């Protein structure tokens, strides 16, 4: 489970329940079979005046808090380096403020140093991750413009620097390279063919799969099978989610209509989905995703994205300071609450029981990361 925003929403008043009983979200998820937590890391998610960017404000100290709770519950950790001060995805990959003006060689060294130094600090704090992804949704590269696709030499240079840094701290930590759009096989082949010619070896191909953006489940399966066979890598669905309602949650955010973005699952995106946006539809989707991963050779698990990001006043995908950094105009607010695994009041949804009760189709297969 990706739980990166949990500290923020808890501090703003979020509470979680299972069968009507309030509990710690980690306790609840542990009881539903969750064995691994994914946590993002931003370099410096603050304005020059120290105002948080929001969306979890996932700096190193927040990582330590969330990671400690995971380890206390016997969960492993996937660390998600963004190499940015805020969101890094196919639409934006901003260079961290402290690295602006660097050339490609300097950025390569900065990635190595930052990765190594943060991992060593995590190790000293007893929260070294068991799995690391070097970059987030690298479909169009990282640290633009020097690492923007089609600058594959620089993309490989930057990613490889991160991989070398991970290996220097602990050579046994598996490394993931993560792209979005898991149903787009030609894009994956093109990207990894270019990378394999230039970059350091790695262990896992990570995919994002959101059914309202990334094609059919059959297209995802085709891509997973091809990637596992073509490159000999394990496959993890690093981000996945499905909505449980199309009911609005404006009353929970307490924002004006011009100040909130609303949910990402617009009606035009979900009208052709194979699953209804209901608690039952969400549960059925998760059952089928787990079966798909289990059936694909090399399938190694999934991370449900932001399972606990329920709507509370003050928590959203960005603040005004963050918008300035990423050069976007907003509006802000939570756009993911109808895809959490808890309803708007924090009650566990049926999909969690589906995840817990899933039985592998083959005795020698199991979902390692969930």
Q: Predicted segment positions?
A:
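Aromatic-lined substrate-binding rim segments of carbohydrate-active enzymes
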Residues: 21-88, 151-172, 220-230
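Active-site beta-loop-alpha junctions enriched in small/polar residues
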Residues: 4-6, 42-44, 82-84, 134-139, ...
